[in-house]
Amino acid sequence: MILKPIGVVKSPFKTQNDAPRQGRFSDAVSEIAIFDEYADGLHKIENLRHIIVLYWMDKASRDKLRVVPPGETEERGVFTTRSPSRPNPIGLCVVEILEVERNRLKVRWLDALDGSPVIDIKKYSPEIDCVNQLEGQQP
């Protein structure tokens, strides 16, 4: 499997300690610069208010399968958490689009570190992406 980045994040977060635990916990503004060869994929993106950004957490540890989540005392498998430490460190954030200028998007709520490769952008659709209640799910 080969993933090709479509762009790069310009972020105020330089290290993992700078970044919020979740992007929604910060109003910091970041920029997503889409590479020229993918810029046409942004056609009409100015009509959207929110998007899903998938990015590669290139500074995250890839050798952990168990972690202790913040606020907890017991280990859990990484697939039951939102930890950046995981075999394939793919980050996912729903962000608010603040401004679009050619191949650059200014966004809020992105927790990616500066220089993180962007691997995909998708339309956020509340009817599909927002689950109000999951029966039987434990916190």
Curated annotation (Swiss-Prot):
Domain of life from the UniProt record: Archaea
Coiled-coil annotated spans: none
Q: Which CDD domains match?
A: UPF0066
**Record domain TsaA-like: where:** 3-133
- What Pfam families does the record tag this protein with? TrmO_N (PF01980)
Residues spanning the signal sequence: none
Family that this chain belongs to: Belongs to the tRNA methyltransferase O family.
Quaternary state and partners of this protein?
A: Homodimer.
Name the record gives this protein: S-adenosyl-L-methionine-binding protein AF_0241
Instruction: Name its species.
Output: Archaeoglobus fulgidus (strain ATCC 49558 / DSM 4304 / JCM 9628 / NBRC 100126 / VC-16)
